[in-house]
């Protein structure tokens, strides 16, 4: 049996990476503006970190645990580039808010190995997220710029020039998971501030039923019904997405038309169809026809009062 101890010395097993850096937001990065870093969940580290990671034989993909020791807050992220100044690292703004970090604070970075994600659940922080037609497709496209997810983090995604914040409520199989080349099921919780109006609609239908019974009891008061003024659509409108409607102040107020309630037919028999028409008796119709004919004869008799003449004289 042969032992290759020298082989193991040439290729040592991977060890963890530990380092402390001064953290800054991406807006402080020298050079051109890096909007792509703000859209994702990856950080920028100095070149010396790459040399150390290579010598330690760290597993790929490179994932890191970020810890703010003073505030006891931690999160996870991937690395985008190794172009930062020595002793500094640059983070997205939303990640610094999660870790309660300020510009120049000390951040502890440690290399970790995370399980591949199988399930995650998100909760939007605004009801405006309901305006998105296909939220799963938008989230899938945004998560391409992320390397991992941590339970409890509030991530920020940008869509149609608007930033949406989502809280990571649940991740499986662990509290922190890798989302690189994974097949992950996604669910959404109701947004913060969203109210379900099904109960209010049910109570409104109950009030309408009660109003119908009361109307049957006062059916005999015809005079009161004629004088009663009805105002249609007294309730307030409700949006399907749960947001409040925008109140627009008009310069000239809209005058509502007042409609008077009509008198119902209380002698109506169920199953009987009536076609009411203005039908005149036959005797009245015949008298009118005779009168019209007499007037026509009289007008014919009174016509041509003069004598007639012939163009051709008759021979005697």
From Swiss-Prot:
Residues 284-316 are annotated as: Disordered. Keywords: Ubl conjugation pathway. InterPro entries: Ufd1-like (IPR004854), Ufd1-like_Nn (IPR042299), UFD1_N1 (IPR055417), UFD1_N2 (IPR055418). GO terms for biological process: cellular response to virus; ERAD pathway; negative regulation of smoothened signaling pathway; positive regulation of proteasomal ubiquitin-dependent protein catabolic process; proteasome-mediated ubiquitin-dependent protein catabolic process; proteolysis; ubiquitin-dependent protein catabolic process. One of its GO terms (molecular function) is polyubiquitin modification-dependent protein binding. The keyword Cell wall biogenesis/degradation does not apply. One of its GO terms (cellular component) is proteasome complex. Belongs to the UFD1 family. PANTHER family: UBIQUITIN FUSION DEGRADATON PROTEIN 1 (PTHR12555), UBIQUITIN RECOGNITION FACTOR IN ER-ASSOCIATED DEGRADATION PROTEIN 1 (PTHR12555:SF13). Functions at a post-ubiquitation step in the ubiquitin fusion degradation (UFD) pathway. This is Ubiquitin fusion degradation protein 1 homolog. The gene is Ufd1.
């Amino acid at each position: 049996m042969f032992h290759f101890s020298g082989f193991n010395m040439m290729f040592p097993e991977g060890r963890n990476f530990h380092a402390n850096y001064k953290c800054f937001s991406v807006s402080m990065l020298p050079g051109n503006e890096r909007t792509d870093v703000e859209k994702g969940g990856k950080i920028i580290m100095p070149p010396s970190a790459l040399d150390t990671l290579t010598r330690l034989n760290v597993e790929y993909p490179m994932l890191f645990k970020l810890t703010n020791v003073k505030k006891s807050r931690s999160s996870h992220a991937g690395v985008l580039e190794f172009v930062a100044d020595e002793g500094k690292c640059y983070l997205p703004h939303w990640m610094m808010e999660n870790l309660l970090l300020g510009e120049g604070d000390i951040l502890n970075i440690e290399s970790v190995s995370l399980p591949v994600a199988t399930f995650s659940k998100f909760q939007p922080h605004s009801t405006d997220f309901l305006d998105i037609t296909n939220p799963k497709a938008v989230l899938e496209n945004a998560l391409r710029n992320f390397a991992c997810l941590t339970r409890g983090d509030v991530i920020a995604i940008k869509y149609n020039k608007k930033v949406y914040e989502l809280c990571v409520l649940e991740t499986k199989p662990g509290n922190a998971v890798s989302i690189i080349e994974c097949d992950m099921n996604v669910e959404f919780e109701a947004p913060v501030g969203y109210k379900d109006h099904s109960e209010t609609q049910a109570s409104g239908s109950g009030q309408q039923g009660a109003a119908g019974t009361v109307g049957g009891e006062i059916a005999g008061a015809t005079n009161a019904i004629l004088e009663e003024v009805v105002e249609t659509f007294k309730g307030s409108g409700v949006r399907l997405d749960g947001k409040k409607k925008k109140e627009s102040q008009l310069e000239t107020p809209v005058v509502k038309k007042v409609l008077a309630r009509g008198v119902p037919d209380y002698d109506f028999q169920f199953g009987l169809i009536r076609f009411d028409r203005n039908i005149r008796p036959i005797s009245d119709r015949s008298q009118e026809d005779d009168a019209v004919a007499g007037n026509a004869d009289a007008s014919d008799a009174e016509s041509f009062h003069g004598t007639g003449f012939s163009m051709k004289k008759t021979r005697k």
